[in-house]
Amino acid sequence: MRKIPLNCEACGNRNYNVPKQEGSATRLTLKKYCPKCNAHTIHKESK
């Protein structure tokens, strides 16, 4: 398992690090709270 940073779609801020399996081919997308936007936004896995 590796820690993957998640970026906010709205502002691009890196807010979370989540564990992910190494062999997974799909990119992770989660709806999480962004303190900079002060709202729940979609966060996508960064490279």
UniProtKB/Swiss-Prot annotation:
NCBIfam families: PRK00504.1, rpmG_bact. One of its GO terms (cellular component) is ribonucleoprotein complex. Keywords: Ribonucleoprotein, Ribosomal protein. The keyword Transit peptide does not apply. Belongs to the bacterial ribosomal protein bL33 family. Gene3D superfamilies: Ribosomal protein L33. This is Large ribosomal subunit protein bL33A. Pfam families: Ribosomal_L33 (PF00471). One of its GO terms (molecular function) is structural constituent of ribosome. SUPFAM superfamilies: Zn-binding ribosomal proteins. It comes from Staphylococcus aureus (strain JH9). PROSITE patterns: RIBOSOMAL_L33. One of its GO terms (biological process) is translation.
